[in-house]
Every structure is written in C-alpha cells, then in structure tokens.
Amino acid sequence: MKRIHLHLLSDSTGETLEMIAKAALAQFENADVVRHFWPMVRSRQHLERIVPELSNNPGLVLFTLVNAETRRALRDHCRRLSLPAVDALDEVTAALEVQLGQEAHGRPGRQHKMDEAYFKRVEAIQFTIAHDDGVGWENWEEADIVLAGVSRSSKTPTSIYLANRGYKVANIPLVMESPPPPALYELKNPMVVGLTTAPERLVQIRRNRLLTLNEQAETSYVEKDRVTEEVKFARRLFSDNNWPVIDVTRRSIEETAAAVIRLHNERHARVKPGEKPI
C-alpha cells in the first residue's frame, strides 16, 4: 500500500481544513496517509519554518490561507519543491465574490469570531448537556428539538452534535414500563423527533455496551424478542403522536443530525412570521 504525506496549513484553528480532508479521505478505503498539521500560520516567517518539513516529507499540501502574501509564498515554495498545492476555499471564495459583488475580507479566523452565533452555540451545548437522558423535562419547552427513542438509539451523541450546530436539544429514553412525562405530549415550540433502529442492530450495540462495562451479557436488555417489542412500542408512540421518525440503523451520527436539521428547517419553513410552530 502506498503511503502519502498530507500537509494541512491553516491561518486559523484548522478545523475547517481538517473537516475537508476527513471528508475527502473517507472516499478512499485503507488509505495510508501521514498527516502533518500546521495551524495558525499567519506570517511569512512562520511559513518559512514549515518549508523544511514540506521538503523532508513531500506530499500533497492542502491549505486555507486568506493572506495573499502568505498564500503566494506557499505556492512559490510548492512549485520549487514540485509539490501539489490545493487552496481548499479558493474556488468557493472566488465564486462568492462574483455573486455578491464584493471582495473577501482576507482576514484569518473570521468564522471563529465571538459573535452572537458563538454564544448561541455555547448556550445550546450547556442546555443540551443539562437535558440529557430525560432530565429537566420542566424546561423542554425551551428546546428547539426533543429526541425520543429506546436505549442506545444514538440520542445523546446526536443531541451533542446538534448542540454544536447551535440547536438546544433535549432527549428522552423510551421504556415500556415507564411512560414518558405528560410534558412530552404538550410541547408547542420544540420539534419532537423519534429515533428508531433495527432490533438486530440494537441488540448488537447493547451487547457491545455491556461488554465495555464488564456486565452480564445475557439479560432482557439484549434479548431479541424483548428488544423487538421495545422498538415496536416506540414506533407506535411516534405514530400515535404524528412525530417524524428517523431510522438510524445505517446512519452515522452526522447523517442522523443532518436529517433532523432538514426536518426542523422544513417545519419552520411552513410557519408564517409571528406564528408558533404547530
């Protein structure tokens, strides 16, 4: 298997660049890639200190540098070293300049500016952590989204992912012997979304969870017929209350969250200004 070096250079935290690289590499199976991460490259002097590493470990250079001088210097070095260099945001930024009729600011780290959106995200994360696993149902009306599902149906990780996107999320486990609080059926503002999965997959996930905790592997918690009844119970509840349902069986957390966001956006698109969501 061929090993390659991938250099990621950013004038900010590098979070955007890492996500782009991760998404691209996901298209290749068993890729042997050595990543070299260079964040906060904001001066020519800093760049010059990195160049020897590029020379010693030649490979693809992927970068997001908004400063024209630093960007030009990096391209010159890559040409001299015969290294392929890709500006991850160049074409997108250029297209937006044409459509918006204005030039990009060219200042690094603007997406991390501590503005209203930043504080909204922090507030969403705090709310979501405080309303995990059925806790704090008295405040659910303040949520944007409430996720419901049986144990191990990815409620918590999906909630945290959504919180990082700025959504206040509460989640509640559905247990046949313990009905949800009445507040769940009285919510007006939040969108309630049901998460379901195939019983076979759920049994597998629960068994792995018990092994991780060094607990007994043979209990009703992982018994196939019992788990099937749990899933049926949850689906009936979703249907009776006309809640949208997402099957997470073959979805990643990111894919599940994207489906929830789409449902949320569609719901609010149907609401006229000044009205409350139905």
From Swiss-Prot:
UniProt entry keywords in alphabetical sequence: Kinase, Nucleotide-binding, Serine/threonine-protein kinase, Transferase
Residue sites binding ADP per the record: G149, V150, S151, R152, S153, S154, K155, T156
Enzyme nomenclature, EC number: 2.7.11.32, 2.7.4.27
Domain of life, per lineage: Bacteria
Pfam families: Kinase-PPPase
Molecular-function annotations in GO: ADP binding; ATP binding; phosphotransferase activity, phosphate group as acceptor; protein serine/threonine kinase activity
InterPro entries per the UniProt record, alphabetical: Kinase-pyrophosphorylase (IPR005177), PPDK_reg (IPR026565)
UniProt-listed HAMAP family: PDRP (MF_00921)
Family note: Belongs to the pyruvate, phosphate/water dikinase regulatory protein family. PDRP subfamily.
The protein's role, per its UniProt record: Bifunctional serine/threonine kinase and phosphorylase involved in the regulation of the pyruvate, phosphate dikinase (PPDK) by catalyzing its phosphorylation/dephosphorylation.
Protein name, entry field: Putative pyruvate, phosphate dikinase regulatory protein
Organismal lineage: Bacteria, Pseudomonadati, Pseudomonadota, Alphaproteobacteria, Sphingomonadales
